[in-house]
Amino acid sequence: MSIKRLTKEDLRETTGVLNPVGHTVLAFKDDAVTTTAATALHGVGMAAEDVLVYAGSEALPRLRERVATASGSAGFGYEITLMRRYLALAEAGAGWLIVYTPEDAAAERVTEVATRLGALCAVRYHRLANEDLI
């Protein structure tokens, strides 16, 4: 079964905790480093539609909303823990990438760029689990 490549519109339309299966969520210290990371990902073969870029100011309100509206049962799981972690990073000015990584080879390229550019987090979402890449 193939995994759908998400768009910004897809993500805007989802509610509750973030769970972009087949994608990796990355945070960088600011928007400038995030832009550099997006360029680096394109340089290692990631297509433009595979890399969604979010400025800190774009991500912060949505993360606040997601944390505030997460269901009660989500409050005890790893997903809401990640959302709270993401919110803290966004409040500190982090920029964000959501990268399509359905295959291990793509995740390896993302991990290399994330490590080289000092990503604050890199979490790959699978169907049944999440994986910290750095």
Segments and roles (model prediction):
Residues 1-134:
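Positively charged, small/polar-rich N-terminal and surface patches that mediate targeting and assembly
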